[in-house]
Structure formats: C-alpha cells, structure tokens
C-alpha cells in the first residue's frame, strides 16, 4: 500500500534538554517528545561535563516519547535532521563510544587544544559527530558545527591542509572525522539505533549546522537589515553574512546553515536562559508537580506573578 502522507524528524540536542519533533512536509508539528538532561558535573570553576552517556540517553528518551505519540505509519517517516549544541568536545574510542564524558561549551578546557593524554581516544569530535555515529555508524560530521579550537578552514569548510595549523591545534587528521556540508546525508539509521530510539531503520540522517545557525535559519534570518537575538542557555545576537571575516574586533564569524554563508555573532551572556531554569528550580519539585497537575507549568506561574512586580 502506498504511503499517502510523509513526515520528517527534527532532533534538537540542547544544553538542558533534548527535543525530537515530527513534522509534515509543510512544516506543521505533528507530535514531539522532550527529555531533560541530567545536571552537569561542575565540581569546580571551569569544569562542565555531561555525565555518563547523557546526550545519547536523552535522545533515546525523547525519541521514544515522540514516536509513542505518532499515530501514522512509521514507514511514512522519510528522513531526519540532526542538530546538537556547539562548542563541545567528544572524545571517542575506536568503536565510536565515549572515552570520557563530553565537555560542555562552558568548560574552560575547550579554550586549549586537546592534550591527547588518554590512550583510549581515537577520534576527537563535536557532539554532532558523536551522535551521528550513534545513529549511523559513520565517522562523519557537519562542517558547520566546528566553532572554537578546531583546525578548520572557514573559507573551504574543510580541515586545514596546513600541517602547521594541525600541529597548533594538536589534532592529527587521522583523529578527525570526515566533514560534509549542511544538507548532505551523513548516513542512515542503523538497526541498533532504531531499536533503541524507535526511529525507523534505514532513513537518511541529514547534516544541519550548529544550534545557533539552525535557530537563525528557522527564524528567517536572511540577507537584509534583520538581526536575531537568540534566547538560549547562551544569549547572543547575530546577523547574516556572505564572507568569512577573520579580523573582526566586536563579533566573531560563525558558519551558517547554508554552505559558504556565515553569521556575524556578538558576544553574549553565558548561562543566560539557564538562569531562568535555576530560578524555577529554587521553588522545588513540589511546586512543579502541583502546577503540572493543574495543567500549567512553573514558568507560566512565574510569568503570572511577574505581572505584579
């Protein structure tokens, strides 16, 4: 029987939670699932690690919630897009599993090249590189998620061919994943990943970009006199650009969701909207349970109270 309607999956792996959303081909949300990440391991200033295999575990939980709410034939899902948080570091063993906890973008160790002090480490990559492997078994990643201490050439969107650059960043080419541009197929969902997540095996996993670039595209940040203020865990502003500006003083150049296009991004506020979550949690689980039982949320209650301030 021919499948009439077709659907896509969007995966958004953030700093605080993971969301998996199923859309129809016109962009309407059909259903979704969300899973909170565990509190980060932050034993001292400058250290911020995602505990255990939390990024993947949250994807499994969010995916199962979304697919559990999907009432159509799973065979009607024809592909998925993968987007994760940027500026993180994942160190993988030869089999693609984590050699150590993922360093979150708030970890100050990311300001320095990877020291290669763990003999288990075979690949050094981003969160999207790691999650791509978990879904597809491939050692590939989107070029547009390599912001920070990486030997990437932002003009070509490939690894630098300059040996001195590779030495500066202390990552030999053999320890880096192969890069593809946003919109390219990274691989296909394996039977193992399908069994864990409920996402149909064999559908293509498509590269997107870093989370801020995906947000910019989704918000309609296109050429013209338009700016975007991104209200995430990290708060920042950005505008569209068409060339890699290397000597900017008051912003940095981030790779966009469109190949060979850029975003000029301001400095920002670290732990910006995370502070909202922190403030909410000060009121305790009892409040959250009580308001959720009434069909609302702690955030909505706080919004209502804020009107009286």
Residue spans of the language-model regions?
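Short beta-strand-loop/turn "lid" adjacent to the catalytic site in phosphate-handling enzymes
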Residues: 68-105, 132-155, 177-182, 186
